[in-house]
Regions:
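N-terminal amphipathic/basic-hydrophobic helices that include classical n-h-c signal peptides
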Residues: 1-22
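Intrinsic disorder/low-structure terminal segments
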Residues: 4-5, 53, 87, 310, ...
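Short, small/acidic-rich helices and loops at N termini and domain boundaries
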Residues: 15-121
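Glycine-biased, small-residue-rich flexible motifs in mid-sequence functional cores and linkers
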Residues: 16-48, 74-75, 113, 119-354
């Protein structure tokens, strides 16, 4: 496949402005090359290039002053001898090149269903995700007004099984969030996240639903709010994807990157995604965490012991803002404090369930 053929084909997919109604995809050549090589939009037995592999390819291309788009029209000899890629990677790229017609079909199909696509090479890619560095998703599919994700965001996470107290706490948190004008970012799990999302939308607030699977089910469920430009649904995976535990955990990481703070209403030690993400967040410093002070959840107790900011029922009733609560209740943990590493080794594997 030569470069002229690739560019002429890419031109066919580049159209006008993105909008929810009659979505028209507008993607740069670099983005299309990235989606072709790394995206999972194309059903194929040919494995996509991993994020880590792509980052290595980018470095090689930059060293010889080449754009990512040029890689798709290169032969194996050019990829190995001029770009400096190894034979294995070059052959993977060659196999992906042959999927170009399938890519156009997949993008056209998404466009017909008002699904937009953006990548790290596009100006509309959410800037907040770039704080994740090498862990940020390369490709995002979405429906709705993507600019909803550009504001000051906050996430709410907690157990999927709620008791009366947890339901009350979540509703009180949402009152503060609504009053302070934040955009809520959630992952769509049942329980606390679902309640937070529905409450935010009912209160006419803005929301981002970042999912890892079953995107079209969520679109049907929340189509009213998408049309009202109050909700954008996003995914870093194929919109048709089914549940995958790795994708689910990655999605939680992306949510952390998008928000200035994550509110944890309840989690037990070693219990699941909320606990696992909270611990990862402590290690990686993706965002600040605000944990509900309660004796009912072992994970909450441990997170607060480890220095995470906490809030009480009195805080929820007060006029103090969430940002002020974060500042007032945050503890600084010394770098040589061994408790974090000890916890992840011994406590994370406990079989407590939310």
């Amino acid at each position: 496949m030569n470069g002229h053929f690739f560019i002429s084909k890419l031109y066919d997919i580049m159209t006008c402005k993105k909008e929810y109604k009659n979505m028209k995809l507008q993607l740069t050549l670099n983005s299309l090359a990235l989606i072709l090589c790394c995206g999972d939009l194309i059903p194929s037995s040919t494995q996509p290039i991993s994020t880590q592999e792509w980052q290595g390819i980018e470095k090689k291309l930059k060293s010889v002053h080449k754009e990512p788009s040029m890689i798709t029209g290169m032969s194996i000899d050019t990829l190995t001898q001029i770009i400096g890629l190894d034979e294995f990677t070059a052959h993977k790229i060659e196999k992906r090149q042959k999927l170009l017609p399938d890519l156009f079909y997949a993008l056209q199909n998404l466009e017909n269903q008002d699904i937009g696509v953006t990548t790290i090479y596009e100006e509309d890619y959410p800037a907040s995700l770039r704080v994740l560095g090498t862990k940020m998703p390369l490709v995002i599919s979405y429906i709705g007004d993507l600019s909803l994700s550009y504001g000051v965001n906050i996430s709410v996470a907690g157990p999927q099984m709620m008791n009366k107290t947890m339901r009350h706490v979540t509703k009180e948190i949402m009152k503060k969030i609504s009053k302070e004008g934040y955009t809520v970012v959630v992952g769509g799990s049942k329980g606390v996240e679902e309640l937070a999302l529905r409450t935010q939308l009912t209160n006419n607030g803005n929301a981002v639903l970042f999912v890892a699977d079953h995107m079209f089910d969520k679109i049907r469920l929340y189509s009213k709010y998408i049309k009202q430009n109050k909700l954008v649904i996003m995914t870093a995976n194929d919109p048709y994807a089914l549940f995958d535990v790795t994708h689910a955990l990655d999605k939680n990481l992306y949510i952390c990157g998008m928000v200035f703070a994550q509110i944890v209403t309840g989690t037990h030690i070693g219990s699941g995604p909320v606990w696992f993400t909270s611990i990862q967040n402590i290690h990686s410093h993706w965002t600040r965490q605000l944990v509900y002070e309660t004796l009912d959840y072992s994970g909450n107790i441990r997170l607060i012991e480890m220095g995470e900011a906490h809030f009480t029922d009195e805080d929820l009733k007060s006029e103090v803002t969430l940002a002020e609560i974060l500042d007032n209740h945050e503890t600084v943990i010394k770098k040589d404090d061994p408790s974090i590493d000890q916890m992840t080794i011994f406590e994370f594997i406990e079989e407590t369930h939310e």
